[in-house]
Amino acid sequence: MNFKFFPQTKEEIEQMLKQAGMNSLDDLYADVPEQIRFRGEYDLPEPMSETEIRSLFDKLGEKNRRLTVFAGAGCYDHYTPAVVPNIISRSEFLTSYTPYQAEISQGTLHYIFEYQSMMAELTGMDVSNASMYDGSTATAEAAIMALASTKKTDTVLLSASVDPKVLNVVKTYAHFHGFNVELIAENDGATDKEQMDARLEKGGVAGVIVQQPNYHGIVEDFSGFADSCHAHKSLFIVNSVAADLALLKTPGEWGADVAVGDGQSLGIPMAFGGPSVGYMCCTEKLMRKMPGRIVGKTVDNRGQRVFVLTLQAREQHIRRQKATSNICSNESLMALFVTIYMSVMGKEGVKEAAQMSYDGAHYLHDALIATGLFSDKYERPFFNEFCVKYNGDVDRLQQRFIENGILGGVKVDADTLMFAVTEKRTKEEIDKLVNIAKEEKL
């Protein structure tokens, strides 16, 4: 047999087999049924030199089309300061795990503590955990948290204006955890509070989940939502785009019990749907029900400041069925990413990026409406994302955008496009998109 793709030599393989008390590789694979074993030669290319491999992948990379992004729907093209990937690429940071021996990992615990502090401030909440996988799983975990925090409940309400991808993840959790998911209808693209109140009156609701801005880009008015939930012993849970909270009213200001969402908008580049980081914050009252790691600050026996994994009995040193969650890792590296991003940008920088995104989106919206080719899908305020109806062929228009190097929005139904704008988009790029739309109709 030819072992040219194995790092071990034939002699080394024979030595390892002998040590294991075997005579051949067939003995090693004896547990694998004969009918599914591969026989014959592998269809692999001949070995290449480093320069040949680099040339091959350069040619493959040239096939990629780089587009100017005006699409969002949960993943946004924000700018990443060069220092961020430079720092997180250090070997000390390249892990997604929080440490098991906290006392010897003070640096890691320190940056997680800073992340928690920043997210708690950004959301206006008391406590943050060390991160979740992404915004969808954070929302689903919040639903379970609501069920664990309330009595005689078996249902979680979600606004129909929540991102469908988030809704699907919550439904998956619900199927295996045995709780019900019910939708609150929309009224002109926003949560229908009257329907929510009517359902709360029937009882059995552990929590209500809304999104801000919602999937349509609308900035909703949640006045009275928390009061309605609390009057019926239910939790009020707000899912938000993290970057937008630099300017918007925070979940804490809306009276939320739990704030969740995706941190991708805090400078994490888009790459085939990831990586990302989910955040989860809550009130101090609910802290012991919150899943995931929590890093705390204390002093050692010499009076020196130290960081520790606190309240571990909630989710690790406990029987599985009693744990707050069975998630045993997190997105520590991406939590570090957004921590460095917010540190480098500073409060004013994060606010400025959000303001530029808001201004750019409203400039694009007004320019599209002015063409006479587009009309508003909803008559409601929006932040940096909005839905407009197009009075032509949406598919053809999107193809024209792509031909001109633009990813022009997300098609949400037969005649509607949803556009998103971030601080990366220039006036020239926005004007180019509008002009392409005009030319398409000529």
Each model region followed by its residue ranges:
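Compact, charge-rich alpha-helical regulatory domains located at protein termini
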Residues: 1-26, 30-39
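N-terminal entrance/gating region of PLP-dependent enzymes' catalytic architecture
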Residues: 32-113
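Gly-rich Lys/Arg/Thr-decorated short loops/hinges at beta-loop-alpha junctions or inter-strand turns
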Residues: 91-102, 120-125, 151-153, 174-182, ...
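Short loop-beta-helix segment that forms the pyridoxal 5′-phosphate
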Residues: 100-104, 121-140
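Conserved PLP-enzyme active-site core in the AAT-like
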Residues: 107, 137-304, 373, 388, ...
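Buried hydrophobic packing segments
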Residues: 116-119, 123, 139-146, 278, ...
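Conserved C-terminal alpha-helix-loop-beta "cap" of PLP-dependent enzymes
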Residues: 205, 348-433
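Active-site C-terminal subdomain of aminotransferase-like
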Residues: 266-372, 376-379
